[in-house]
């Protein structure tokens, strides 16, 4: 069934970007011969009560793949005693919204709503996380998605943040979870048009065509 409403179109685009990223990660894991299980086991490593970078990387990758259920499982198994309760509740809400499907955005015909107080509480921590001596950009990425902060910009510290698809995924994620998602989607579309091709500095014209198509 072809999505017709702006919200359904945005959800379908999010589902596509999530599946695409899942394929990218699967290829990387196959090439490096590193199992996801071994990576998850690394999540249990802590230092001075602070969760390891591996933990936040896996939670970020799972949310980026649209798998909030698995992200919630990782949080419960490895970090429940060390994570801000607001973060736990937000991930749990996303997992509940996903239900039994493989992708949070798969067949979604409703607007996912998250507690505004929890989102604001997480948002208040984003800037302080960035100002730490060695900020964990995966944690910043998770907090940014959950709180609905402005879309992630490219980062030299996290390879996954460099792709235009990551920008669009986070931008659409934010747009569909506000009180007036249609207005937010229109604003995002207008922003892409205003920025123009020069903002998306890739040699191919596809670097601008992709955000243009994804937000129309």
Task: Give a label for each model feature.
Residues 5-8, 12, 82-85, 117, ...:
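Alpha-helix boundary/N-cap detector
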Residues 14-17, 33, 37, 106-124, ...:
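Alpha-helical repeat scaffolds
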Residues 92-137, 141-145:
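Eukaryote-biased recognition of long, low-complexity, charge-rich segments
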Residues 21, 25, 29, 66, ...:
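Helix-turn/linker elements and helix-coil junctions of extended alpha-helical scaffolds
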Residues 13-20, 24, 39, 86, ...:
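Charge-rich, solvent-exposed alpha-helical interaction surfaces
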Residues 1-38:
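Intrinsically disordered, low-complexity acidic/proline-rich regions
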Residues 39-97, 208-216:
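Extended amphipathic alpha-helical scaffold segments
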């Amino acid at each position: 069934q072809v999505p017709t409403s702006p919200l359904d179109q945005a959800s379908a685009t999010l589902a596509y970007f999530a599946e695409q990223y899942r394929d990218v990660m699967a290829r990387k894991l196959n090439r490096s011969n590193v199992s996801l299980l071994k990576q998850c086991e690394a999540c249990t490593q802590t230092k001075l009560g602070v969760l390891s970078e591996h933990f936040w990387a896996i939670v970020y990758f799972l949310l980026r793949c649209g798998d909030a259920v698995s992200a919630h499982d990782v949080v419960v198994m490895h970090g429940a005693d060390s994570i801000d309760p607001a973060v736990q509740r937000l991930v749990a809400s996303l997992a509940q919204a996903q239900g039994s499907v493989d992708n949070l955005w798969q067949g979604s015909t409703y607007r996912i709503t998250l507690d505004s107080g929890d989102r604001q509480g997480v948002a208040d921590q984003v800037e302080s996380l960035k100002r730490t001596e060695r900020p964990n950009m995966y944690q910043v990425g998770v907090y940014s998605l959950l709180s609905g902060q402005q879309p992630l910009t490219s980062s030299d510290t996290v390879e996954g943040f460099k792709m235009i698809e990551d920008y669009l995924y986070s931008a659409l994620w934010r747009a569909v979870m506000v009180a007036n998602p249609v207005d937010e989607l229109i604003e995002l579309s207008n922003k892409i048009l205003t920025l123009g091709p020069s903002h998306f500095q890739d040699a191919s014209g596809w670097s601008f065509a992709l955000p243009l198509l994804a937000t129309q």
